[in-house]
Amino acid sequence: NFDWWIKRFKRQFELVDILRLDHFRALSGFWRIDGKSKNAKEGTWVESPGKELLHSLKDFLNVKILPIIAEDLGIINQEVTDLRRDFSLPGMKILQFAFDGNEDNPYLPKNIVENNCVVYTGTHDNSTTISWWNDLDENIKENINKNCNLSKDTSWALIQLGMRTKAKLF
């Protein structure tokens, strides 16, 4: 009945209006590793009851749309995307991931066509924007400047770039 999860979400929603659910991917499936395994390579993907959990949470909160942002980064398959879309949860777009020179990169601002997402300059797993910028190869910096005219204040330029995307939230 997801009692532990429901209590945890209930408490969080007493503190905040919206949650970013880290590792949302695990609500579709997770990598199970036997406790006796010597490394994580020996695991298998296992389907998880995320859909049932999200339905239970919606019922408990009595809402049409859950106030959750899905961290849909990493190994994301169609099942994860479908789960996020089935519950109208916004996903995440990270500008620091955008500028690898691939014109089809889904994080490139011009390729953010879905508005049900949140654009971030980076995440808690990344360096700060200025540290990220300072550590970049000059070729990548040139590629970024092709996509946006960065001023001396890189952080603000990326914020402005993110705010110009079609994303609902920044």
Model-predicted segments: where are they?
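Alpha-amylase-like alpha-glycosidases and glucanotransferases acting on alpha-linked glucans and related
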Residues: 1-169
